[in-house]
Amino acid sequence: MSLVYLSLAIAALWINLTGLGLAARRWVGDYAVARAAGIIGICLIGFFIEHFVPFGPKPPVLPLTTLGSLWLMWRNRATLRANLPGEALFLLGFAYCMTWRYAFPNIDFSEDKMPNYGFIVTYMRGGRLPPPDLWLANFPANCYYSFQHYGAALMGRVLCIGPGLSYHLAFCCLVGLFTMLAGRCVTLLCPWRPGLWIIAASLLVGGNGVVVAAHFLIHNPYPTDEVRFLGGAIVHDNLTALGHAVSGWMAKPGHEALDLPMEPFSFFLTKGDFHPPLAGFVLLALAAALIAAQETGADGRERRANSLILAATLPVAFISNAWIVPFQLLLVGGWFASAFLRGDRSWVAPALLGGVVATALEYPFLIDFTQQAIGDNAAIRLTAAGDHTPILGWLLTFWPVVGILLLALLERERRTLALYLVVVWAVALATSEFLYNHDIYGGPWVRFNSTLKWWQWIYAGVVLTLGSLNLGSRSRVARYGTLLMLLPCLSFAYDLGRQYIGMRKEDMGQLSGAAWIQKDIVIANMIMDLSSRPDGVTIESGLVMANTESPAVTLFSGKQSLLGWPWLEATWRGGFIDVNQRLAQMNQFYSNALPDPLGWLLHNNVRYVLWLPRDNVDHNSRFLPLNDQIKARYFWHHCYGNDRDFSIGYWERIDRLPSK
């Protein structure tokens, strides 16, 4: 990808985001909060309207919004100058994230990158919402909390860029927004200037408590070893003598080690998975900044606006990252309750208005989403006695935040705020240990998703709120004690740096995300050819009940799959029988074992049938018999090979012209 093109896209994005934030300052006093509220607000409004009237794939608004933003920037240049530190924090987070995305841009089948990319692709079509499910033909994409993906797609549509670049720029934008909001929270709570950079570093490159001990327990640990320490460390191949001893203390006789990941924000952003926890972190930082503003002198109109936005974060969390709703409610609802007990009633009407308006804007989505089977896979349950975190492992992971919690009890200047936050985070930590979300996983992974989604959010919340409060405290014990909690964890920056330097960067700068599969020039040309053809249901081989390379060719061609990853669709749709039936029938089709392949293709409205290198088994013995059975209605597009013992290409359905 041309650096000129990338630079123009980033410049257009920054100008429009700055203009949007300045426009929002008419109602919201704080610069950082105004930008976040403006972004969320415009996305919510679009999300609502497009359920009735679609904007199209490329709404022609970029010239107008850019000119309007430049005018607002000139008119409010004094405001921009006054808020340069906040702007610098946004650009710091954006640029740091871009160093990872630019070096490692592939959107492959690791983690959930491909399905997250698929949501962006389907929203970029610009049709009436809900859009079609790209991984389950004939069904709408209304079974997942995908507001973050809608926002990324809306950005890409306005900027007239592709889904791959939209994926990466939206990722960097959310990291920049998180950094900006976190910086605002620190600035309000901590007058000690170094505190800002310590908290920012702790969030962007700092690790959890394990990183300090990991180098004594594991030979040459990598970041993955440290974030997957609970469970992984017990069975690690490269344990030191001390590591073997600790492993023995943590192991439970007769129990397989539980896999309890604790991926801090610093690690999460390096993976490149545009997953809903990103939005969860932004909502955390937004709530923290709003609470800090309310506690440090916001009054009148600004206080009412802050209360409105704070309440609105709850319904927004439900459609962005439903996993953190209970904890967002604890944080936000806890502050409202605290204010009420102190005799502050000014928040009541604005908070009700904010919650009602945000919910109303989400209503068209919610009436479908709340009826989907994904909710049947979730139930909060008590953690069984044998499924608790080993005490030693828990302490090795959480000792920094436990220390920060205890040190916050020494805070005297803002004692009410400190006690409220201590209670909130202590309850959150206890809840994450004694309760879990019972989903599709079991055995050693019974708490996997719960700890993966909850711990990282709680850890970041403690560091951001109480860490800032402690570093700004007049108590030297609280201030320097918190430094002792945070500084050792910054050693994670070394491990991240070692990983960044050591990993191959052969696809650097290919921000379409498809470089990994387009290394094969034939596949690259097939994707280019398919992308230019009309929409239609597409099938390709290689699906199993796990993450697979399939259906990457279909996805990067912008086409809809008859079936994507079957395990994921089954999860979203509650074990929908049709998913397993489609998987079995597709495997039969590619094995040339389907009784009537032509009838099956026509019945499922399949327009494109891909034949890829992996289909050329047994000297391509299945190709000619299959071609003979479907050629009456499907035209073969030859891409490579001799169409006998080796073939790469695809069939396209021949649609007969209507009779005159």
PLM regions and their residue ranges:
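Membrane-interfacial loop-to-transmembrane alpha-helix junctions, especially the N-terminal start
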Residues: 26-39, 81-88, 194-197, 302-307, ...
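Extracytoplasmic
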Residues: 494-660
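Start-transfer (signal-anchor) and selected internal transmembrane alpha helices
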Residues: 54-102, 190-201, 304, 411-422
